[in-house]
Every structure is written in structure tokens, then in C-alpha cells.
């Protein structure tokens, strides 16, 4: 029974990877909307775009690592 619960927990933790993809889409979509409204300010916001994408991807990687730990270490 304990092994099955670890697999269920890993599956639930893997949902965070999908949530990271949604977060990256939101960040990129909002950047694109702002760049289309004000093209002259788009170049100065590129660094902020990459920082936002990096934070969203980091959360997805952490969720993936938790899923792997639940699958193989517990």
C-alpha cells in the first residue's frame, strides 16, 4: 500500500510541471501584449521576461524533482 501511495503522490507532484508551462505561457503572453502596445519599451523588458520564465521553470523543475524523489527514494 505504501508504494502505491508514493506513486499517487508523485503523480500529484508532477502536476506542478504542467503548472510551470502555464506560468511560462502567461509570462510570455503578457510580455507580448505589452510589447505590441508599446514597441519602444519592449527592448528594456526582455531581461524581466527571461527572469520571469526562469522562475516559472525553476518551480516546474522542483516539482519534477519532488516527483522523482517520491517515486524512487520513498
Curated annotation (Swiss-Prot):
Residue(s) at site: Reversibly protonated during proton transport: 57
Keyword Transferase: no
A GO cellular component entry from the record: plasma membrane
Keywords: ATP synthesis, Cell inner membrane, Cell membrane, CF(0), Hydrogen ion transport, Ion transport, Lipid-binding, Membrane, Transmembrane, Transmembrane helix, Transport
GO molecular function: lipid binding; proton-transporting ATP synthase activity, rotational mechanism
Positions of transmembrane segments: 5-25, 49-69
Superkingdom of origin organism: Bacteria
InterPro entries (UniProt xref): ATP_synth_F0_csu (IPR000454), ATP_synth_F0_csu_sf (IPR038662), ATPase_proteolipid_c-like_dom (IPR002379), F/V-ATP_Csub_sf (IPR035921)
Membrane topology summary: Multi-pass membrane protein
UniProt xrefs under Pfam families: ATP-synt_C
Subcellular location: Cell inner membrane
Keyword Membrane tagged: yes
Subunit structure: F-type ATPases have 2 components, F(1) - the catalytic core - and F(0) - the membrane proton channel. F(1) has five subunits: alpha(3), beta(3), gamma(1), delta(1), epsilon(1). F(0) has four main subunits: a(1), b(1), b'(1) and c(10-14). The alpha and beta chains form an alternating ring which encloses part of the gamma chain. F(1) is attached to F(0) by a central stalk formed by the gamma and epsilon chains, while a peripheral stalk is formed by the delta, b and b' chains.
Entry's family note: Belongs to the ATPase C chain family.
PANTHER family given in the database record: ATP SYNTHASE LIPID-BINDING PROTEIN, MITOCHONDRIAL (PTHR10031), ATPASE PROTEIN 9 (PTHR10031:SF0)
Entry function: F(1)F(0) ATP synthase produces ATP from ADP in the presence of a proton or sodium gradient. F-type ATPases consist of two structural domains, F(1) containing the extramembraneous catalytic core and F(0) containing the membrane proton channel, linked together by a central stalk and a peripheral stalk. During catalysis, ATP synthesis in the catalytic domain of F(1) is coupled via a rotary mechanism of the central stalk subunits to proton translocation.
Name under which the protein is recorded: ATP synthase subunit c
Organism: Roseobacter denitrificans (strain ATCC 33942 / OCh 114) (Erythrobacter sp. (strain OCh 114))
Amino acid at each position: 500500500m505504501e508504494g502505491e501511495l508514493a506513486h499517487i503522490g508523485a503523480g500529484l507532484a508532477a502536476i506542478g510541471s504542467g503548472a510551470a508551462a502555464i506560468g511560462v505561457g502567461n509570462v510570455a503572453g503578457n510580455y507580448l501584449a505589452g510589447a505590441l502596445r508599446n514597441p519602444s519599451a519592449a527592448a528594456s523588458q526582455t531581461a524581466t521576461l527571461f527572469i520571469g520564465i526562469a522562475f516559472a521553470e525553476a518551480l516546474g523543475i522542483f516539482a519534477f524533482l519532488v516527483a522523482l524523489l517520491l517515486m524512487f527514494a520513498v
